[in-house]
């Protein structure tokens, strides 16, 4: 997505065009067809688990799906929210949005948003681990008979993107 660091502008525009507008909660038909949005946005660190964004109903599902990756130490499931990344645009219109918990590596301290934020700071083994886990969760989500459990639909948030106009 573009404009993430300026206020989730790219993902917000996509969600508004295809799924609904969180400022008035006028949802589009496609909103009911998407099961989940997965986001991997914190650099090259290994996946350690998933922020569930307060979605208690999905906890047993992800626990089962992550079990095969216990040897890769990707077992943490927290109901806590995490912010400042694109899954929030989807969550704001009632689509389950999840951010992976990752090892921070140098992400916040040395390379994040600097001219040092380049491919030579990637860790191939971490990327392979992350790709495997993300692919498995996307596959499990797609093959599931029903959509992932959803939290109650949030109230309209007319102020949510006012800061970025």
Segments predicted by a language model, with ranges:
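Acidic/histidine-rich catalytic neighborhood of metal-dependent amide-processing enzymes
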Residues: 1-61
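Active-site-adjacent substrate-binding region
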Residues: 43-165
């Amino acid at each position: 997505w573009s404009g993430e660091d300026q206020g989730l502008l790219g993902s917000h525009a996509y969600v508004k065009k295809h799924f609904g507008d969180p400022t008035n909660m006028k949802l589009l038909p496609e909103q009911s067809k998407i099961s989940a949005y997965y986001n991997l946005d914190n650099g090259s660190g290994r996946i350690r688990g998933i922020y569930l964004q307060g979605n208690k109903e999905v906890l047993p599902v992800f626990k089962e799906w992550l079990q095969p990756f216990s040897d890769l130490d990707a077992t943490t499931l927290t109901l806590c929210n995490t912010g400042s990344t694109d899954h929030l645009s989807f969550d704001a219109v009632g689509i389950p949005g999840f951010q992976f918990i990752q090892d921070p590596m140098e992400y916040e301290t040395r390379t994040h948003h600097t001219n040092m934020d380049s491919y030579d700071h990637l860790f191939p083994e971490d990327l392979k681990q992350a790709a495997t886990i993300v692919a498995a969760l996307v596959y499990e989500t797609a093959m599931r008979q029903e959509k992932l459990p959803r939290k109650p639909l949030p109230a309209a948030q007319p102020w949510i993107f006012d800061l970025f106009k």
